[in-house]
């Protein structure tokens, strides 16, 4: 099956390059579009008590760093990246919204095979939320 638009969900770790390379290798034969997305935690939802933190400044700084990292990842891909998207909130819902808005027919994401991922797996959440084809790439520290 030829995909038309592949969305790569990245956490901006060094392993994100592995995911982008996989997506590009799938996209090239059919000249499919490739887009990147990073979903950040909405920090204002985490702080419910009295804390003297300027969340607006922190959120702004994180957004700028995210845009910069996505731009670098896009430039390193050696492929024309269609969109570099950044969102915050629930990972599954943000991806579902992007899938609808941009006509995505394949999602590529990674799965860290470590202790914490057994307890809280983003990939498992996506399997139950996303209704397009998915490629889940196992990520190890040695890659």
Curated annotation (Swiss-Prot):
Kindly report the protein's main subcellular placement as a broad class. Answer: cytoplasm
Q: Which domain of life is it from?
A: Bacteria
Q: Which residues form a coiled coil?
A: none
GO cellular component terms listed in the entry, alphabetical order? cytoplasm
- Locations listed in the record: Cytoplasm
InterPro entries according to UniProt: Rossmann-like_a/b/a_fold, Universal_stress_UspA, UspA
Query: CDD domains in the record, alphabetically?
Result: USP-A-like
Write the record's keywords in alphabetical order, separated by commas: Cytoplasm
Checking Gene3D superfamilies in the record gives: HUPs
Q: What does this protein do?
A: Required for resistance to DNA-damaging agents.
Which PANTHER family does the record associate with it?
Answer: STRESS RESPONSE PROTEIN NHAX, UNIVERSAL STRESS PROTEIN A-RELATED
Name the protein family: Belongs to the universal stress protein A family.
The record's subunit annotation is: Homodimer.
Name the record gives this protein: Universal stress protein A
Organism (species): Photorhabdus laumondii subsp. laumondii (strain DSM 15139 / CIP 105565 / TT01) (Photorhabdus luminescens subsp. laumondii)
Q: Which gene encodes it?
A: uspA
